[in-house]
A protein has these predicted regions:
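Conserved PLP-enzyme active-site core in the AAT-like
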Residues: 1-136, 146-155
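Conserved C-terminal alpha-helix-loop-beta "cap" of PLP-dependent enzymes
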Residues: 158-182
Length: 182
């Protein structure tokens, strides 16, 4: 699908200069490593820079799915957040990769007023230092235990991915309406 979209963009005369991908979707579905590698290869062939938005996937991918770490992929930039699986905050994003690109992005961040304040740096170091892949595995195992309890109570309304369980908004609304007799 991505290759078709890339081909269509090039056929339309568009210059594809950047390709961004997300390893772990907001829905908590993981992109398979083979798909990531295929996208990277196609993007490289097109001469595009590659950014991986790895907010939650930076830790879930390696710890749960035995995928490479973000920068072990052939990408130019990787980003993640410290408020996701296995880290303890603060709530901010990290950017790593090609030093020149990171410097350019950081300068733009300063211009826009969205850079991390230096007073947060010690908390960033602490969060990264305490990180262990086992913590992610433990969090996922606990989530699966909670999912079993939820399924016993809510049945097939519980939706599961390999790393999370959830009740969808429409199911919560339906249950509330049932309880209200509506």
């Amino acid at each position: 699908a991505f290759g078709d979209a890339l081909d269509a963009a090039r056929a339309a005369g568009e210059n594809v200069s950047v390709v961004a991908l997300t390893r772990l979707a907001v829905s908590y579905e993981i992109m398979p490593e083979r798909d990531i590698q295929k996208i990277i290869a196609l993007a490289r062939a097109a001469g595009a820079k590659i950014i991986v938005d790895d907010a939650g996937g930076a830790r879930v991918g390696p710890a749960i799915f035995d995928q490479p770490k973000s920068l072990e992929f052939d990408v130019d930039i990787a980003s993640t957040g410290l408020d996701k699986y296995g880290t303890i905050g603060p709530r901010l994003g990290l950017l790593a990769g090609d030093a020149d690109l990171v410097a350019d992005i950081r300068a733009t961040g300063f211009e826009l007023g969205v850079e991390a304040r230096p007073m947060l740096y010690p908390a960033v170091v602490h969060s990264l230092a305490q990180y262990k892949p086992q913590r992610v595995r433990d969090l996922v195992a606990t989530t699966k235990q909670v999912a079993e309890v939820m399924k016993a109570r809510f049945g097939n309304r519980v939706s599961e991915t390999p790393v999370t369980a959830q009740l969808k908004g429409e199911d919560i609304l339906e249950m509330a309406m049932e309880r209200a007799g509506i």
